[in-house]
From Swiss-Prot:
It comes from the Bacteria. The lineage of its organism: Bacteria, Pseudomonadati, Pseudomonadota, Gammaproteobacteria, Enterobacterales. NCBIfam families: PRK14426.1. The active site is at R20, N38. This is Acylphosphatase. Residues 5-92 form the Acylphosphatase-like domain. It catalyses: an acyl phosphate + H2O = a carboxylate + phosphate + H(+). GO terms for molecular function: acylphosphatase activity. SUPFAM superfamilies: Acylphosphatase/BLUF domain-like.
Length: 92
């Protein structure tokens, strides 16, 4: 199956609620690599690389609201240059 890389920008109540760490756990469980980081505007940027189906499952999990305590109001995605990452990290 083809590998894809997606950049996602997640808006809503997504900082201070464990969103990045929960996204990391979900991504690793799906075999997806990349990173999540807080942005200055209150959003979270997620870059996900892996099998298309696994990346789509991660995006669907994010759309559904992510972890308890988070609220996703908007999710924007765009293609990202295919970058094989070693693992899924939290960036600061």
């Amino acid at each position: 199956m083809a590998k894809v890389c997606i950049a996602a920008y997640v808006y809503g109540v997504v900082q201070g609620v464990g969103f990045r760490y929960s996204t990391q756990r979900q991504a690793l469980a799906l075999g997806v690599t990349g990173y999540a980081r807080n942005c200055d505007d209150g959003s979270v940027e997620v870059v996900a690389y892996g099998e298309q189906q696994a990346v789509e499952q991660l995006m669907e999990w994010i759309k559904q609201g992510g972890p308890r305590g988070a609220r996703v109001d908007r999710l924007l995605t765009e293609p990202y240059p295919a970058t094989p990452f070693e693992t899924f990290k939290i960036r600061y």
